[in-house]
UniProtKB/Swiss-Prot annotation:
It comes from the Bacteria. Changing residue 117 to Q: No longer protects against bacteriophage SECphi4, SECphi6, SECphi27 or P1 infection. Disruption phenotype: Not required for msDNA production. This is Retron Ec73 putative ribosyltransferase/DNA-binding protein. The lineage of its organism: Bacteria, Pseudomonadati, Pseudomonadota, Gammaproteobacteria, Enterobacterales. The keyword Chloroplast does not apply. Keywords: Antiviral defense. Possible ribosyltransferase/DNA-binding component of antiviral defense system retron Ec73, composed of a non-coding RNA (ncRNA) followed by this protein then a reverse transcriptase (RT). Expression of this retron confers protection against bacteriophages SECphi4, SECphi6, SECphi27 and P1. At multiplicity of infection (MOI) of 0.02 cultures grow normally when infected with SECphi4 without collapsing, at MOI 2 cultures enter growth stasis. NCBIfam families: STM3845_fam.
Length: 316
């Protein structure tokens, strides 16, 4: 399809130009009830999978927090590792970008790395109010560096900064591998996360959606919608569509991989044999034009020329 996208007058080229013209005219709106992003930090098991506690939190969110997307940094790193250029980025900067994108940051204090993450995030006054700290009840009143340093910094900023959830945590290496009583914090966690922070829709300008200059919730949601409208897509096809919408001045590959990484991490898109496609199967944004007509132009092209491309949806 890449050739057809680059060639003027083709069906998909006309569809892309039409899409671009409406984005240019600020015809994209973010609804007030859009899902929140929750960055979940903590330990990993010996096999590299998330700790049992983090898996319990993800399962809880999928069952009861339909207004939230939980995501892990590891899956974003994995997507970026497929590109040699992106490998030059240090993980601290990437994690900092992810924390800025998130509405909330949950840190389960269960490993040395999670204590390090707490210190890094608590250092930023902008991030302190996003933090939800899960800690062992036995450490509530302990005069430790954690309590007297990062946690005190969070609470001193304001009464609204951060949330602290405690329960009797199992200790030792087995606590990473096996579930404990983390369910004790589910009710207060639900109370924190189930609230919608925004009630009204927003009109989005073109420059706010450009993935070369933004890595935020709006640009991530827009990339999903592009894939849903125009896809399933290969990476080079996505780059060509984004270039036609936002212009040729920027190099999009590395920035798009970061966006794709977060979308894969929250299981909103998937990638099979180099083909990216939506698992969400609905638009994040509202469009003040016939977005389904543009989508049908792409789908008709695939059915005529690449019917095998549409088979990725068969197993969803």
């Amino acid at each position: 399809m890449l050739t057809q996208l680059k060639k003027n007058g083709t069906e998909v080229s006309r569809a892309t130009a039409l899409f671009s013209s409406f984005v240019e005219k600020n015809k994209v709106k973010c609804p007030g009830n859009v899902k929140k992003f929750v960055f979940l930090c903590g330990a990993n098991k010996n096999n590299g999978e998330p700790s049992a506690r983090r898996l319990e939190l993800i399962n809880f969110s999928e069952r009861y927090l339909n207004n939230c997307h939980f995501f892990l940094a590891e899956l974003v790193f994995k997507e970026l590792s497929t590109d040699e250029e992106s490998l030059s980025d240090n993980l601290l900067d990437i994690e900092a970008d992810l924390s800025k994108l998130a509405d909330h940051i949950i840190i389960v204090l269960e490993s040395y790395s999670s204590f390090t993450e707490l210190g890094a995030f608590a250092y930023s006054k902008q991030l302190r109010k996003k933090l939800i700290i899960v800690n062992n009840t036995k450490f509530i009143n302990e005069k430790s560096f954690i309590n007297m340093g990062p946690i005190k910094a969070i609470t001193q900023q304001s009464q609204q900064s951060g949330h602290f959830l405690h329960y009797k945590m199992t200790e030792g290496i087995e606590s990473i591998e096996r579930s404990d009583g983390i369910g004790e914090i589910f009710d207060p966690l639900y109370d924190i996360l189930s609230k919608n922070d925004r009630a009204i829709s927003r009109t989005l300008k073109k420059e706010e959606l450009d993935p070369s200059s933004n890595f935020n919730k709006d640009s991530v949601r827009f990339i999903h919608d592009v894939i849903f409208v125009c896809g399933p897509l290969q990476l080079n096809e996505l780059i060509e569509i984004i270039t036609k919408i936002f212009g040729t001045e920027s190099h999009y590959k590395k920035n798009l991989l970061k966006h794709l990484g977060i979308l894969i991490a929250i299981r909103i898109i998937s990638c099979t044999n180099g083909i990216y496609y939506s698992l969400y199967k609905e638009y994040y944004f509202k469009y003040d034009f016939d977005i389904d007509n543009i989508s049908s132009m792409f789908k008709v092209f695939f059915l005529k020329n690449k019917p095998e491309r549409m088979r990725v949806y068969e197993n969803i």
